[in-house]
Amino acid sequence: GPRRAILYTSLTPGQLPLDQPIDAACGALAIFVGIDDATGNLLFVANRLAWYPDSLLGDLKMDIGLLETIQNSKPLRGEEYEAFYQMLAAAGRTAAGELSRRAYNQLVHDAKQLGDKQREIEAAGLPLSEDDRIEEAVLETRLDYMRKNASHPFVPLVEHPDRFNGELIMLRGTAYRIVKVRINESEIRKRFGIDHYYQIDMRVNLEHKVKLITSRTAEGEEDKIREEKIVTQHPATFCALSLPPGMPTGDHLLEPIRVAGFYFKNWQYQTAEMRGDQAAERVAPMLIGRAPVWD
């Protein structure tokens, strides 16, 4: 029958409490070191404890504790690759169209919550402060955007990325670049059965105009130069395991797509645009999913 085991590990998920009983689905790639003579417990050591909570990603066997390694508004780092490939593999375990259906259902639920909140404000019948009027206008704008585009509001994904890591999101936009990325690491190919994925760079229409503020350091100067401009579109990146039949790849594309994927991070990347003698840097939400819908 089942035997009690003791695992010694250097890393545990930060959301799991210490020094108290828990009931959590966990696992580890561990080394068996022996049996405790006094208790008969099996003894193991491992680098980290994997956590599979009752959530879509947890059900798809992604170690949710790896989301804690992600740093938003920074380039993709080596420490994040395990989370990246586990999320990619998790997307591959879904049925065709499953992520789109689930994301749409979540979108309907979120729209209902926003609608309920909007009605609460209207039903109160109280004089609105300036902040309340702004909140009401934002709610109305986001609801209108969700209903017309069947996609999640985009601006919060950039303003508050820490709220969305690991969440299922649906976006609609235009793919302007699609490249096939080959995975060179043999261990990754063997463990996950993945030898490539597609990076889709797309532009998404925003729910409202946004002031984009960037900074750069001029050549020979120490102080950063602040730059501002009003934008109505924003880039996003979608990493997919496959493409629809016949979908083109390369640069200078104008392909209408819908994507449903897990929000990995708001990542920083270099663009083809030059500022002085350096490539300009931008940040954009990165989603990971099974395949885009080509409209």
Identify the function of each model-found stretch.
Residues 1-295:
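OB-fold and OB-like single-stranded nucleic-acid-recognition modules
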